[in-house]
């Protein structure tokens, strides 16, 4: 069974749900006079806070799926330059569509902005600063990963490369990024460079590189299609294994996410595919697919709602599951509204053409 674009959308829908959990329930210091009620769980944490911490996996999931889609898209259509230009236009187009609506709303709500105003606005527009919403930080490293995709592809497709060798290189590279580079940058010779914005953005991109490369390798070896086929053949066994592995991932994630989320994400996806092959999974899959279609806009919008614009409204339901569903509904509705607003000019042009043709 082939891993399709629909499957990608469904997984993005899961990832955006994890992102909302992460931002809603992980940072009590960012809540101003509001809170949430959740049942106790493990290690002194509530279930909501545990799921919020696990929700950090969303970054690695989106990054891995980005690498997976990039490899397949470039393999099918060819032309790395065209691919890079097309994906950068898509990424920044989605960002700018929300940005030009968010800035005036933020100013009307008297949200603080950088000074001088125009300089700060230009930096924010280019994705070099995120005064209006820090959760937009993902724009820059993902753009850099897109630009660097040809190098990642050459690594994956190099002569005599084997799956085992590629994954060992990936694990070794991840160890260098997380354990060696920070020590090297502490050297007096490099201390000045280590404090620059350039290094900060570059290092953030490097920390996401293993997940992106993992996606490329999983696409090269068609591992997700193989996982989906296995789930179809051994449904009961895969379902039971997925439940156990997911429970283990949720439990250990607070202790290992920093350096190993590229592995956690690669393990999580086959588990999700196994659960989606059940009746309940098939029932909720269309909802997740719709969420996945709007996942980029929902990512850009939801943090504005829960941190900057209407926090008291978002946390009004009081109970964690209701808060999550409330923000999910509002974010999806706002994303659809953004899509509708930007479709109006095209609809008007189509209507004029139809009227002209009728005459």
Predicted regions and their residues:
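Aromatic-anchored segments of alpha-helical transmembrane domains
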Residues: 17-24, 125-128, 170-185, 239-253, ...
């Amino acid at each position: 069974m082939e891993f399709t674009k629909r499957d990608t959308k469904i997984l993005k829908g899961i990832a955006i749900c994890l992102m909302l959990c992460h931002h809603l329930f992980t940072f009590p210091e960012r809540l101003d006079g509001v809170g949430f009620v959740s049942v106790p769980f493990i290690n002194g944490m509530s279930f909501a806070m545990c799921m919020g911490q696990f929700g950090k996996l969303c970054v690695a999931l989106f990054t891995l799926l980005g690498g997976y889609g990039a490899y397949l898209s470039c393999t099918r259509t060819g032309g790395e330059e065209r691919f890079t230009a097309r994906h950068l236009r898509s990424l920044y187009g989605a960002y700018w569509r929300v940005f030009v609506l968010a800035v005036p709303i933020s100013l009307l709500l008297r949200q603080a902005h950088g000074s001088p105003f125009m300089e700060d606005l230009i930096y924010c527009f280019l994705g070099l600063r995120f005064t209006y919403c820090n959760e937009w930080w993902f724009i820059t490293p993902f753009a850099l990963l897109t630009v660097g995709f040809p190098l990642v592809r050459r690594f994956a497709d190099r002569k005599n490369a084997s799956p085992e060798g590629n994954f060992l290189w990936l694990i070794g590279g991840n160890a260098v990024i997380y354990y060696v580079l920070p020590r090297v940058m502490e050297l007096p010779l490099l201390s000045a460079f280590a404090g620059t914005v350039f290094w900060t953005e570059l290092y953030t991109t490097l920390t996401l590189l293993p997940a992106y490369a993992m996606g490329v390798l999983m696409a090269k070896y068609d591992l997700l299609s193989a996982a989906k086929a296995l789930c179809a053949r051994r449904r009961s066994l895969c379902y039971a294994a997925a439940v156990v592995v997911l429970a283990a991932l949720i439990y250990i994630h607070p202790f290992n996410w920093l350096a190993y989320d590229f592995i956690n994400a690669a393990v999580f996806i086959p588990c999700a595919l196994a659960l989606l092959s059940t009746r309940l999974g098939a029932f909720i899959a269309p909802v997740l697919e719709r969420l996945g279609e709007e996942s980029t806009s929902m990512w850009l919008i939801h943090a504005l709602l829960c941190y900057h614009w209407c926090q008291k409204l978002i946390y009004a339901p009081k109970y964690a599951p209701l808060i999550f569903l409330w923000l999910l509904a509002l974010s999806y509705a706002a994303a659809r509204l953004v899509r509708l607003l930007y479709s109006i000019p095209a609809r008007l042009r189509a209507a004029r053409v139809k009227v002209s043709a009728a005459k």
